[in-house]
């Protein structure tokens, strides 16, 4: 029995719950694993750091949701999501950040859509929808 990394709901043999997928897009019925390992994500974050408009200590990537292909894609510009992979020195950082946001929401704070997605090495990557971006694209 699996638990959805977006909603924490039980989801049987599926990777994500229907509710979790609908939080990302009403058009999603499945979501492929992110096409990068945690290590590859950290490398991409290093190479793209000068492009990213959001700074900070944690490695992060800009991404967009491609609903036609049921996957999250790393992009240089126009991303609607920020991805944060597993950290080399601080294990389970994405899980910690997701739980912190969930607790903030439970006490009544407004938080953007967030959760975790599976990567190709079966690690979890934290995602959060950018609240400073508006428009039609996911």
Segments predicted by a language model, with ranges:
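Regulatory N- and C-terminal appendages and interdomain linkers associated
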Residues: 1-39
């Amino acid at each position: 029995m699996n638990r959805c990394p977006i909603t924490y709901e039980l989801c049987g043999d599926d990777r994500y719950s229907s509710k979790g997928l609908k939080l990302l897009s009403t058009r999603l019925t499945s979501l492929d694993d992110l096409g990068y390992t945690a290590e590859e994500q950290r490398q991409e974050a290093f190479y793209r750091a000068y492009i990213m408009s959001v700074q900070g200590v944690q490695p992060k990537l800009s991404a967009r949701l491609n609903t036609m292909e049921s996957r999250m894609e790393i992009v240089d510009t126009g991303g609607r999501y920020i991805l944060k992979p597993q950290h080399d020195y601080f294990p389970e950082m994405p899980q910690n950040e997701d739980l912190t946001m969930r607790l903030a929401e439970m006490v009544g704070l407004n938080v953007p859509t967030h959760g975790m997605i599976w990567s190709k090495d079966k690690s979890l990557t934290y995602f959060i929808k950018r609240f400073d971006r508006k428009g039609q694209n996911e």
